[in-house]
Amino acid sequence: MKKVKITAIRKVQYDDLMARYENPIAHTCDVCEGQSWISEEGKCPDGLCPEAWKTMREFVEALARGEGNFYDGWMKNPRSAMISCNDGFRPVSFYIEAIEQV
């Protein structure tokens, strides 16, 4: 299986939506832009947000198996994907790419 690199590319926060719709929460996202993890054998890397993993898992597993070219040419690099976590108030965009043959 291939190793898959997961990189946080962009993190945004919609303060207007948070003020209007969200109840205050004690802990928010710790992910920083540029932070990266390596998935081995299609498994969730230590330290990656479990909720973010839920949105990217199928893509990471497919890339680890050597698959790619999602949605018939969606990405310039067919062995990659751009996935966002499901937090509508402070989403993080992750670039996922197969990096090595094991």
Locations of regions flagged by a protein language model:
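Short, charged beta-turn/beta-strand-edge "cap" motif at the junction between a beta-strand
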Residues: 13, 41-47
